[in-house]
UniProtKB/Swiss-Prot annotation:
It is an enzyme of class 2 (transferase). ATP binds at residue 129. This is Hydroxyethylthiazole kinase. It comes from Zea mays (Maize). Substrate binds at residues 58, 206. Keywords: ATP-binding, Kinase, Magnesium, Metal-binding, Nucleotide-binding, Plasmid, Thiamine biosynthesis, Transferase. One of its GO terms (biological process) is thiamine biosynthetic process.
Length: 280
């Protein structure tokens, strides 16, 4: 979708109503999201999906994929705790014909991980979401892409990865989202910026994994417009972080309050506080 014309006409008003419309659709339809995700993130990803109104399913057995995955509305694949046992399930689920989202956690950590990410990327995800270092490494097709690699945390700012994200989007035909202080979402041509969120969210493990799961739920509602779905999911998640921070004393209480905030979000808050714009 060319969001430029819509934004020029209505700006933040359009984005606010679009974000609310997608969240409302998730609440009304309760999309079933299969999550083949890392062990660290299962709890927060499931709770974020539930708070948004989706139905999470942490189903990763290869023997279940043929029966279960076709019933799902979307699939979320995360390589954070990648193992040879899980990779066939990831391949099978990604090939099942459902819209799916890839989180290439720590893509540059090992040759095995990079090879797996590139193989999954070839299976046509609707969205790829990672931090700047992950997107830079994936775009370069090299484990040596970042000499300052810092595990699952990014050693680059999100703006550093915009051009890499655009190139990756064009080569893979996926929407690519780069998380950071400002999030960027691109289809290779348009770049959308999302400015919601608070720094302390980075102190909670697996928040990136959780927002990728939320993106999958939004993509399930709008599979033909993944760039808008991804941008709105990122904005909603950042917004509930802002709301949660108003009551939080630290990372643990922020985790609790942001999940509550997601469950309680109303139209007025969403339409007035999401900060999404088309990057010139």
């Amino acid at each position: 979708m060319d969001v430029g014309a819509k934004e020029e006409e209505m700006g933040q008003v359009w984005w606010g109503h679009r974000a609310w419309s997608l969240l409302s659709a998730v609440r009304a339809r309760a999309p079933l999201v299969q999550c083949i995700t890392n062990l660290v993130s299962m709890d927060i990803a499931a709770n974020v999906l539930l708070a948004a109104g989706a139905s999470p399913a942490m189903v990763h057995s290869l023997r279940e994929v043929p029966d279960f995955t076709p019933r799902c509305d979307a699939v979320y694949v995360n390589v954070g705790t990648l193992s040879e046992d899980w990779l066939p399930s990831m391949r099978a689920a990604a090939s099942a014909g459902r819209p799916w989202v890839l989180d290439p956690v720590a893509a540059a950590a090992s040759g095995f991980r990079m090879k797996a990410c590139l193989e999954l990327l070839s299976l046509c995800p609707a969205v790829v979401r990672g931090n700047a270092s992950e997107i830079l490494a994936l775009a370069s097709r090299s484990t040596a892409a970042s000499s300052n690699f810092k595990g699952v945390d990014s050693s680059h700012c999100s703006v550093d990865a915009i051009e890499a994200a655009k190139a990756l989007a064009l080569s893979s035909s996926a929407v690519v989202a780069v998380s950071g202080a400002v999030d960027f979402v691109t289809d290779g041509k348009q770049v959308i910026s999302v400015s919601n969120g608070v720094p302390m969210m980075q102190k909670i493990t697996a928040t990136g994994c959780a927002v990728t799961a939320l993106i999958a739920a939004f993509v399930a509602m709008e599979p033909s417009d993944a760039i808008v779905a991804a941008a709105c999911a990122l904005a909603i998640f950042g917004l509930v972080g802002e709301i949660g921070m108003e009551s939080a004393k630290g990372p643990a209480s922020l985790r609790m309050h942001l999940i509550d905030a997601l469950y309680c979000l109303n139209e007025e808050t969403v339409t007035s506080r999401v900060r999404i714009s088309l990057r010139p």
